[in-house]
Amino acid sequence: MLPVLTMLLVTFVLKDICGRMGMTDYIVEKTEPLLFPAIFPAMVFALGAVLAFTTGSDWGMSSIITPIVFPLGSVIGANPVLIMAAVISGGTFGSHACFYSDATLLAAQSAGIDSMEHALSQLPYNVIACVLAVVGFMLTGAVM
């Protein structure tokens, strides 16, 4: 329980620091002309997936990009439900595709196999889910 509380505390401190620096406003101002609401959820999914894969942390990634992508999505007119779905889906994909994430290590240990073997056996399913998620976010972003 202590690691979760520590992460929450660090998240609030990071949010306060970013707010005082005006980081969110700066990012929104610089990227708004380049983004379209129809493809924004797919972009958020891809960003979340890459960050969660490289860091191995689903919740850490979510706490970093959520304060940035929600104001940005609001400014460009993207659907907030799709944005949250993209953040959660990207984090889940990245966490399960990562070779050293907690989800991979726990699943491999509970099955009694090597973590790399488990990760490689999951990779084709993760890639299929990733492609379907990107297509789904593109379609729903265009419709909603």
What is each PLM-predicted segment?
Residues L2, V28-F36, M116-L120:
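Alpha-helical membrane-interface segments at transmembrane helix boundaries
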Residues S89-M144:
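Juxtamembrane and boundary regions of transmembrane helices in multi-pass small-molecule transporters
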Residues M43, L47-V50, V69, I128, ...:
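Lipid-exposed faces of alpha-helical membrane segments in multi-pass integral membrane proteins
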Residues M1-M23, A38-V50, T54:
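Core transmembrane alpha-helical segments of multi-pass membrane transporters/permeases
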Residues G56-P67, F99-A103:
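Transmembrane helix boundary and interhelical junction motifs in multipass membrane proteins
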Residues A38-L51, G77-Y100:
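Alpha-helical transmembrane segments of multi-pass membrane proteins
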Residues L5-L9, G60-S63, M84, C98:
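Residue-level signal for the membrane-embedded core of alpha-helical transmembrane segments
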